Amino acid sequence: MSEEQFGGDGAAAAATAAVGGSAGEQEGAMVAATQGAAAAAGSGAGTGGGTASGGTEGGSAESEGAKIDASKNEEDEGHSNSSPRHSEAATAQREEWKMFIGGLSWDTTKKDLKDYFSKFGEVVDCTLKLDPITGRSRGFGFVLFKESESVDKVMDQKEHKLNGKVIDPKRAKAMKTKEPVKKIFVGGLSPDTPEEKIREYFGGFGEVESIELPMDNKTNKRRGFCFITFKEEEPVKKIMEKKYHNVGLSKCEIKVAMSKEQYQQQQQWGSRGGFAGRARGRGGGPSQNWNQGYSNYWNQGYGNYGYNSQGYGGYGGYDYTGYNNYYGYGDYSNQQSGYGKVSRRGGHQNSYKPY
């Protein structure tokens, strides 16, 4: 089997300038990445930014620790990948053998990582996630054990410290559980577009549960965007096959909206399949890319990463400040006020972030 490559974050320095956050160690994921680019790429970099499923994942992957053969154990045990059923079973088994390691010191090397975790069992392979521009460690990596029992031993130990820093090992298989995404953000929508027209268009993809039409709290007029929640996840997948949709007389930009809980899960563990993984897998089977979705872990405000999950700027020029905990979008209408009032039909209120 060929090695699956862990890509880098994309141009972290450029993203920092684009989003307008502080310099230094803040290299978080940039929400200004378009959904289309996100589906075709991996995780992006930017200061204090959220993610719309990532940015570029690839970059300079030849640096130390940028590659890992996620299928080594399968080959060592004499397995073949002759059928989709076997492929899925083998992938599920490998989930039991691998771990995500967060909170690493910037000085921790691949050798340090392997030496430490070898105390718990044979390490088949490991990697550190590196910034493709600077070559600097991004503070997390992955370990593949020979046996799942080694993972259990790691988890049984209450605290792990490497190079003087408490680290955070997690089971990689935890990434498999995720809530379905049923909500979208529609930008570039004319405030004059009737709700009936919006419902008619998007109802063609599946049953609409609710439509939120944000109002300007000063003018009491509708803003140039809305949120739509569907009964099921499938309509969202269909809609996201195109970045732009013509709704009434408006050419609208569509992005996936997520609850805070969904967003945090996506940032830490990523999505297997669905929107972000769609372009990365091979055929109908699960992707072999270990790093799929993990690369934005550092955006969780964890340890030295220091990136709070709120207050992200930039999402194609949308500003959700004050809109009932919807944030991370930037300013679509170039107005400074929050959104306050919302005209809503059915459903329940929640706090959402971009995907």
Curated annotation (Swiss-Prot):
What are the Phosphoserine sites (modified residues) in this protein? S71, S80, S82, S83, S190, S271
Q: Give the modified residues of type N6-acetyllysine.
A: K165, K243, K251
Tell me where in this chain the PTM N6-methyllysine is found.
K119
User: List-wise, which residues carry Dimethylated arginine?
Assistant: R345
Gly residues bias (residue ranges): 43-58
Modified positions (Asymmetric dimethylarginine) in chain numbering: R345
Post-translational modifications: Arg-345 is dimethylated, probably to asymmetric dimethylarginine. Methylated by PRMT1, in an insulin-dependent manner. The PRMT1-mediated methylation regulates tyrosine phosphorylation.
List where Low complexity composition bias occurs. 11-20, 27-42
What Gene Ontology terms describe where this protein resides (cellular component)?
chromatin; cytosol; glutamatergic synapse; mCRD-mediated mRNA stability complex; nucleoplasm; nucleus; postsynaptic density; ribonucleoprotein complex
> Could you tell me at which residue positions the Glycyl lysine isopeptide (Lys-Gly) (interchain with G-Cter in SUMO2) crosslink is annotated in this chain?
K72, K129, K197
Which residues are reported to carry the modification Omega-N-methylarginine?
R272, R278, R280, R282, R345
Annotated Gene3D superfamilies? 3.30.70.330
UniProt key word Repeat:
yes
Which cysteines in this chain are paired by disulphide bridges? none
Q: Which residues carry this modification: Phosphothreonine?
A: T91, T127, T193
The protein's superkingdom reads Eukaryota
Quaternary structure (record): Identified in a IGF2BP1-dependent mRNP granule complex containing untranslated mRNAs. Part of a complex associated with the FOS mCRD domain and consisting of PABPC1, PAIP1, CSDE1/UNR and SYNCRIP. Interacts with IGF2BP2. Interacts with GTPBP1. Interacts with EIF4G1; the interaction requires RNA. Interacts with EIF3B and RPS3.
Say what the protein does: Binds with high affinity to RNA molecules that contain AU-rich elements (AREs) found within the 3'-UTR of many proto-oncogenes and cytokine mRNAs. Also binds to double- and single-stranded DNA sequences in a specific manner and functions a transcription factor. Each of the RNA-binding domains specifically can bind solely to a single-stranded non-monotonous 5'-UUAG-3' sequence and also weaker to the single-stranded 5'-TTAGGG-3' telomeric DNA repeat. Binds RNA oligonucleotides with 5'-UUAGGG-3' repeats more tightly than the telomeric single-stranded DNA 5'-TTAGGG-3' repeats.
Protein name listed in UniProt:
Heterogeneous nuclear ribonucleoprotein D0
- The gene name reads HNRNPD
